[in-house]
């Protein structure tokens, strides 16, 4: 009976250590993902601004032409 309690305590102790290590790794992975998201947001903003500028360059001359009627 005593040896069974010892082995159960050992399994419980090792299991809690394993769970805490997994939780630390999971937190580290989440931090890395958050850091990567910031970089991808910047890339999306850069792509959006480039596209917006190209559209504006095409639309503005036509708009000025129609507004001021000087083509």
From Swiss-Prot:
Cite a single Pfam family from the UniProt record.
Answer: FSAP_sig_propep
Where is it made, tissue-wise?
Expressed by the skin glands.
- Where's it mainly located? secreted
Q: Which domain of life is it from?
A: Eukaryota
The compartments listed are: Secreted
Signal peptide, first to last residue: 1-22
Query: Propeptide at which positions?
Result: 23-45
- The intrachain disulfides are 65-71
Which family is annotated? Belongs to the frog skin active peptide (FSAP) family. Brevinin subfamily.
The identity of this protein, by name, is: Brevinin-1SN2
The source organism is Sylvirana spinulosa
């Amino acid at each position: 009976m005593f040896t069974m309690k010892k082995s159960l305590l050992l399994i419980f102790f090792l299991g809690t250590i394993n769970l805490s290590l997994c939780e630390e790794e999971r937190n580290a992975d989440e931090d890395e993902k958050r850091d990567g998201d910031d970089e991808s947001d910047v890339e999306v903003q850069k792509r959006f601004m480039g596209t917006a500028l190209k559209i504006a360059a095409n639309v503005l001359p036509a708009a000025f032409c129609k507004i001021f009627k000087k083509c």
